[in-house]
């Protein structure tokens, strides 16, 4: 079926995609590999050499960190995007960009097929397939691990049989995905929800009890909803995230252990490390509480939840997602200021916040005599505010609350 066909594979250098690359070669296809640097921290040249050794005709290594931060992470920050209220969606945010670049690479080499290493149980298969269909419906998507129905131990054996070096063993069978915005760890003993992750699972975050005994204060500056400075120093978003990952991670901040509802209908146990993402979203929410009206603050979480669901479900390039983007962007016009946080042994606590267009006014809020709040207006306000309730009670009296006749003795 694939004999002589050009196929561009989203290549990570890990077990799944390395097995796919060899499989394509065995099928007589002309496999090309695309490695997209989203901040994984792996030497790109090592990945290139590995793909060529396995059988890739050509390997594209593209640095997409700035595009990822600008076009995918930035909207997620403004939307406080957390799936299930906890997962900052770093993998889900990266997939539409990878699919977009796969299409570009396919056009460059004249490929008719693009491929990924997703399994049939995961969410990524949906994200890759749906995004490709949205951008290039003429291309055929191939997913060998899913279609082949090979389990992880079988993949490891296949890799060993074909001399494919992989960082996964039967003794350490973790599946890891990482980019600028976070790191996920799953599979192996982590599939038991009662199993506590051992220290070897984590790379970005220190064990909280072993973190420094002195707290670290950081100040994040925002302009129109986006972080632009760290401790007073203006930084590009990519560099700011990198620095904050290191700082917060050193203090054990940024771990998530959750049961997650996957798009395919099953629950999974997920371990995440996202020091910068969780701290930035925490700070951003705090600044919004200072600069947005009560009505916006009440309504925006519903938009944020739907934004997170669309991202998680692979519906990034859809009309609804674009409409939500427009709403969120409008809310961010005044979200400028700074938030100071205290990082200490796994916790991140807001220690202060300020904004040039803050809606908070100490003169109005203070209980001191110099308060400018006109308390004499309160009685009239309460009378009007409670009028509908009083009118309802008058027309529809509650018998249990009716006056009782005085008892006679």
UniProtKB/Swiss-Prot annotation:
PANTHER family: ARGININOSUCCINATE SYNTHASE (PTHR11587:SF2)
GO molecular function, one term: argininosuccinate synthase activity
InterPro entries xrefs: Arginosuc_syn_C, Arginosuc_syn_N, Arginosuc_synth, Arginosuc_synth_CS, Arginosuc_synth_type_1_subfam, AS_cat/multimer_dom_body, Rossmann-like_a/b/a_fold
Pathway: Amino-acid biosynthesis; L-arginine biosynthesis; L-arginine from L-ornithine and carbamoyl phosphate: step 2/3
Binding annotation for L-citrulline: 87, 123, 127, 175, 184, 260, 272
Keywords: Amino-acid biosynthesis, Arginine biosynthesis, ATP-binding, Cytoplasm, Ligase, Nucleotide-binding
GN (gene name): argG
Protein name per the record: Argininosuccinate synthase
EC number: 6.3.4.5
UniProt binding sites for ATP: 10-18, 117
């Amino acid at each position: 079926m694939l004999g002589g066909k050009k196929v561009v594979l989203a290549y990570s250098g890990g077990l799944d995609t390395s097995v796919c690359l060899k499989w394509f070669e065995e099928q007589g296809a002309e496999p090309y590999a695309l490695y997209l640097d989203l901040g994984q921290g792996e030497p790109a040249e090592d990945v290139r050499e590995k793909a060529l050794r396995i059988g890739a005709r050509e390997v594209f290594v593209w640095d997409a960190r700035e595009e990822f931060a600008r076009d995918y992470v930035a909207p997620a920050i403004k939307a406080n995007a957390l799936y299930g209220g906890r997962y900052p969606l770093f993998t889900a945010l990266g997939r539409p960009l990878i699919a977009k670049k796969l299409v570009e690479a396919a056009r460059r080499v004249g490929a008719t097929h693009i491929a990924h290493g997703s399994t049939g149980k995961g969410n990524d298969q949906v994200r890759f397939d749906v995004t490709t269909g949205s951008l290039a419906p003429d291309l055929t998507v191939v997913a060998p691990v899913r279609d082949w129905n090979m389990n992880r131990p079988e993949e490891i054996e296949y890799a060993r049989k074909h001399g494919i070096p992989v960082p996964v063993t039967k003794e350490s069978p973790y599946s890891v995905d990482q980019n600028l915005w976070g790191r996920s760890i799953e599979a192996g003993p982590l599939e038991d929800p009662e199993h506590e992750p051992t220290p070897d699972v984590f790379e970005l975050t220190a064990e909280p009890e072993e973190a420094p005994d002195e707290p670290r204060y950081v100040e994040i500056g925002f302009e129109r909803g986006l972080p632009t400075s760290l401790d007073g120093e203006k930084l590009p978003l990519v560099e700011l995230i990198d620095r904050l990952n290191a700082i917060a991670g050193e203090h054990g901040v940024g771990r998530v252990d959750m049961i997650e509802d996957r798009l395919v209908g099953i629950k999974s146990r997920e371990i995440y490390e996202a020091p910068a993402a969780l701290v930035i979203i925490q700070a951003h929410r705090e600044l919004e509480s200072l600069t947005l009206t009560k009505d916006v603050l009440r309504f925006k979480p519903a938009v944020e939840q739907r934004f997170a669901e669309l991202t998680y479900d692979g519906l990034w390039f859809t009309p609804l997602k674009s409409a939500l983007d427009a709403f969120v962007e409008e809310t961010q016009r005044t979200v400028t200021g700074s938030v100071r946080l205290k990082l200490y042994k796994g916790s991140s606590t807001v220690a202060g916040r300020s904004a040039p267009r803050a809606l908070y006014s100490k003169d109005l809020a203070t209980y001191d005599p110099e308060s400018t709040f006109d308390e004499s207006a309160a009685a009239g306000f309460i009378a009007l505010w409670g009028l509908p309730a009083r009118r309802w009670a008058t027309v529809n009296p509650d018998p249990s609350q009716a006056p009782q006749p005085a008892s006679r003795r």
